[in-house]
A protein has these predicted regions:
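Predominantly a Rossmann-like dinucleotide-binding segment in NAD(P)-dependent oxidoreductases
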Residues: 64, 176-182, 187-297, 396, ...
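Active-site beta-strand termini and strand-to-loop segments that position acidic
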Residues: 305-311, 335
Length: 456
C-alpha cells in the first residue's frame, strides 16, 4: 500500500471511529431532556455584546488545510495586517503546501504541526489571537475548546457542534475563558442576505412572522468520493436521521428574525422522509464488492422541521443533500407588508397595484450593504461562494483589529447547530416537539446584543 493510500485509510478509520463515538454522544443527548429544559447555572457572565480586545494586527493559526481550509487561507492572506503564524493538518504535504502559500504571499513561514491528531494542541499554545478550525465535524468542539482554554478566540466551521452537550461545552468555555467562539457561517455575508437584512431593519416587509431556510444541495459525488470530505462526511448518514447541516440556511433567517437580539428559538418539530437516493446512487455507481455497497443509510432524503420562536414566529427548515436537484437555501421571509424569496432573489411589497414579484436589483442602490459597496469588487475577484467568504473573513479580521463586538457569537453557534440533535430526537419520537435550550441564559433580549455587521 503506497503512502497516500495508507494516509487515506488511516483518516477513514479515524472518521469511522469518531462517528461511532458520536453515536453514543447523540443517543445520550436524546435521553437527557434536562440539557434542553434548563440553562445550567454559571458564575460566569455573558459574552453577549463583549467586544474583542483591539489587536491592530491579527496573529492567526489554521487547523485543517484541505479544500475548505485552503480557501480560507487564501482569503486571510489577502487581508491587510493579518499574519498567518501556524498551520496544522494530519497530512504533512498539506501543511507544506499551506506554508508555501504563506511565504508566497510575502509572510514568514508559519510553524507547521503535522504530527498526528493531537498536534493541534501544540498550535493552540502559541502566541496567537485567533484559531481557525476547518476540520471534520467531530473535531470542531475539542479544537475550539483547546483554543479558548489557551487564551485564543476560536473561529469554527459549520456546524459548530453535533450534540446539545457539545453546544453547552462551547458556551461554558467561552464564558469561562472570556474568549469568543465564532461560527464561520459564510452565508450570512452574501450580498443578497445582507441587503435583505437591511430591508428588514428598514421595515420594508413590516412585522416578520415567518421565514424559510434550507440546505438543498446534491452532494452525492462528494459524499461518496475516496478523498476529501468523502472520507468522513457520508458516515453520519449511517448513524443519524435528522437535519445534519442546518446552519447555511438558518443563519441568515435567524438574523432576519433578530434571534438573540430580541427573540430566540423556543421549540421545533421534525420529520424525515424515507431514505432512498443515497443508497440508489451507491448501487448505480459502485461495483459489487466495494465497501460502500455494504453501508446502510438511515438518514431520510429530506428532513423537514418547523421552529417556533419565543415571540410566536415560525421557521421552515429543510435538509436534502442526496437528491438530484438545483441548489437552494430557500432563504425567504414573510411579513405584514411584503415578502422576500430567493433563488432567484425577488421582492413583493404590498400595494394596490402590486400583483407580482419585483426583481431585487431595483432595491440595490438603497439597500446594498456598506461592506459590499466598499469591498465587494475584491470579494468577487477572490471568489469563494460569490465573494461571501471574503466578506466574512474581512469582517471578522476587522472586528479583531479594531476591537468591535463580533457579528456572530457563541450563542449563535450553539443555537444554529442545535437543530441537528433536536431534529434527530423529534424524528425518533414521531415528530414530538423538542425544546431549544436558552444558551444565552435569558440574555437573548438584552440591550447588549449588537446588531449584525452594523458597527463601523
Amino acid at each position: 500500500m503506497d503512502k497516500e493510500c495508507k494516509d487515506i485509510s488511516r483518516r477513514s478509520f479515524i472518521g469511522r471511529t469518531a462517528i461511532g463515538g458520536a453515536g453514543l454522544l447523540i443517543a445520550t443527548d436524546i435521553l437527557r431532556p434536562e440539557l434542553a429544559t434548563a440553562a445550567p447555572k454559571t458564575a460566569n457572565s455573558t459574552m453577549m455584546g463583549v467586544p474583542f480586545e483591539a489587536t491592530g494586527r491579527v496573529r492567526l493559526g489554521i487547523i485543517g488545510v484541505g479544500g475548505r481550509g485552503s480557501s480560507l487561507l487564501q482569503d486571510l492572506l489577502a487581508i491587510e495586517n493579518v499574519e498567518v503564524k501556524a498551520i496544522c493538518d494530519l497530512v504533512p504535504e498539506k501543511v507544506a503546501r499551506a506554508q508555501k502559500a504563506v511565504t508566497n504571499a510575502g509572510q514568514a513561514e508559519p510553524a507547521g504541526f503535522p504530527k498526528g491528531e493531537k498536534d493541534f494542541e501544540n498550535l493552540t499554545k502559541l502566541e496567537l489571537d485567533i484559531v481557525y478550525i476547518a476540520t471534520p465535524w467531530n473535531w470542531h468542539v475539542p479544537m475550539a475548546v483547546s483554543a479558548m482554554k489557551n487564551g485564543k478566540h476560536a473561529a469554527v466551521e459549520v456546524p459548530a457542534c453535533r450534540t446539545l452537550q457539545e453546544c453547552w461545552e462551547l458556551v461554558d468555555t467561552s464564558e469561562a475563558t472570556r474568549k469568543h467562539c465564532v461560527i464561520l457561517e459564510n452565508c450570512c455575508y452574501g450580498a443578497t442576505e445582507m441587503m435583505v437584512l437591511g430591508m428588514v431593519h428598514d421595515g420594508l416587509f413590516g412585522e416578520i412572522t415567518h421565514g424559510e431556510a434550507a440546505y438543498l444541495h446534491d452532494l452525492r459525488g462528494i459524499l461518496t468520493s475516496s478523498e476529501g470530505e468523502g472520507l468522513w462526511r457520508r458516515f453520519p448518514h449511517i448513524n443519524r436521521n435528522g437535519n445534519l447541516y442546518p446552519t447555511h440556511g438558518l443563519g441568515p433567517v435567524a438574523h432576519y428574525l433578530d434571534i438573540h437580539r430580541g427573540d430566540r428559538f423556543d421549540y421545533m418539530v421534525s420529520v424525515s422522509s424515507a431514505e432512498a437516493s443515497l443508497s440508489a446512487y451507491v448501487k448505480a455507481n459502485f461495483a459489487e464488492g466495494d465497501p460502500k455497497r455494504a453501508e446502510k443509510y438511515i438518514c431520510g432524503d429530506m428532513n423537514t422541521s418547523i421552529i417556533k420562536t419565543q415571540k410566536g414566529r415560525t421557521i421552515l427548515l429543510q435538509h436534502d443533500v442526496v437528491n438530484p436537484r438545483p441548489y437552494s437555501r430557500l432563504n425567504s421571509i414573510s411579513g405584514t407588508k411584503g415578502a422576500f424569496a430567493d433563488y432567484p432573489p425577488r421582492v413583493f411589497v404590498d400595494g394596490p397595484k402590486q400583483e407580482d414579484w419585483q426583481n431585487i436589483d431595483g432595491f440595490r442602490v438603497k439597500y446594498e450593504h456598506p461592506l459590499w459597496k466598499t469591498t465587494g469588487d475584491l470579494a468577487r475577484k477572490m471568489g469563494g461562494h460569490g465573494g461571501m467568504d471574503y466578506i466574512m473573513n474581512f469582517r471578522l479580521m476587522d472586528c479583531l483589529k479594531r476591537g468591535l463586538v463580533p457579528d456572530i457569537n457563541v450563542y449563535d453557534a450553539a443555537a444554529w447547530s442545535a437543530p441537528t440533535p433536536l431534529s434527530e430526537a423529534s424524528v425518533a419520537q414521531n415528530g414530538t416537539p423538542q425544546k431549544f435550550p436558552d444558551f444565552t441564559r435569558n440574555q437573548w433580549n438584552s440591550s447588549n446584543s449588537a446588531g449584525f455587521a452594523v458597527q463601523t
